[in-house]
């Protein structure tokens, strides 16, 4: 990319809301204040969102957990998907180049629908997006088929607020497999339903595009996640139908799913904790490579309101680069960013001494 374009994007990057310290109230959040330009804020600079900050007052009820209730439909469908994806791997050498490029592009766009869309925009409100970008992200999110934005954001806010408890939908204390995919194969813990149902989701209920997606999600996901990626290679450049189905659809979808799941599993079990050694989330560079920038997870749980979800800008963080490009085009704005001073203070106060990001 030409240097002058990178300089323009970098300049757009600097036009952010600077958070000089975390908001009050929580294990992750001290009692300091914010700075936006020359103004000081005594509360979160995201007035529309409060329910993604850790709640240290919540504790699991004593006693044995309820018996797992398997959802056999999900188990069978996930097994079939991954069998199809494994077969797709064997077909990759026989695929046309256009099919491989198309599948990769579909993977990246789908991933952005989760990372830049469901996660950083709608779950945490770390930046704002104009209608064309929101429309792109809602389509990309539908391509990813990981539940609609409303449900994804509700589960993710519960994950942050009640992290590592039974009210956390993918509680990593229940093991790698459960936090990776097992939580999707069983009925939700009663605490997840109870606490998740009480979260304030009024910001998303008021967003017509999010609720439109939720209303028409099933036909939308069938078209965008399965029909379109299968038919385009087959119809447009003569790929075999089996290659299109197993590589462009099954393999691509399985890779996107597992890249996202690794944030919940591997990034809570393996890696450094330079920002907060008291929480399980970690900096995992391999996860960040697969999940287009979401692997700096210790930072993200320490500072969930930072739009970059990382201390280091574009370092193995394509999602931040994408958002900054959108800002250059005027489609993204009001990006929240934690100041260097606040980050260093947090490292000194609660870090594990590794002083490494990823």
UniProtKB/Swiss-Prot annotation:
UniProt cross-references to PROSITE patterns, sorted A to Z: FATTY_ACID_DESATUR_1 (PS00476)
Upregulating conditions: Up-regulated by agonists that activate NR1H3. Slightly down-regulated by a high-carbohydrate diet enriched in unsaturated fatty acids.
Cellular compartments annotated: Endoplasmic reticulum membrane; Microsome membrane
Catalyzed reaction equations: octadecanoyl-CoA + 2 Fe(II)-[cytochrome b5] + O2 + 2 H(+) = (9Z)-octadecenoyl-CoA + 2 Fe(III)-[cytochrome b5] + 2 H2O; hexadecanoyl-CoA + 2 Fe(II)-[cytochrome b5] + O2 + 2 H(+) = (9Z)-hexadecenoyl-CoA + 2 Fe(III)-[cytochrome b5] + 2 H2O
Role summary: Stearoyl-CoA desaturase that utilizes O(2) and electrons from reduced cytochrome b5 to introduce the first double bond into saturated fatty acyl-CoA substrates. Catalyzes the insertion of a cis double bond at the delta-9 position into fatty acyl-CoA substrates including palmitoyl-CoA and stearoyl-CoA. Gives rise to a mixture of 16:1 and 18:1 unsaturated fatty acids. Contributes to the biosynthesis of membrane phospholipids, cholesterol esters and triglycerides, especially during embryonic development and in neonates. Important for normal permeability barrier function of the skin in neonates.
Family in the record: Belongs to the fatty acid desaturase type 1 family.
Annotated region (Disordered), positions in chain: 16-39
Cofactor(s) the protein needs: Fe(2+)
Cytoplasmic side: 1-71, 118-216, 263-358
One GO cellular component, as annotated: endoplasmic reticulum membrane
Recorded name of the encoding gene: Scd2
Segments on the Lumenal face: 93-96, 237-240
Keywords: Endoplasmic reticulum, Fatty acid biosynthesis, Fatty acid metabolism, Iron, Lipid biosynthesis, Lipid metabolism, Membrane, Metal-binding, Microsome, Oxidoreductase, Transmembrane, Transmembrane helix
Sequence positions that bind substrate: 74, 147, 154-155, 187-188, 261
Motif (Histidine box-1): 119-124
Name of this protein: Stearoyl-CoA desaturase 2
A single GO BP: monounsaturated fatty acid biosynthetic process
Protein source organism: Mus musculus
Residues annotated to bind Fe cation 2: 159, 268, 297, 301
Sequence positions that bind Fe cation 1: 119, 124, 156, 160, 300
Entry domain remark: The histidine box domains are involved in binding the catalytic metal ions.
GO molecular function, one term: metal ion binding
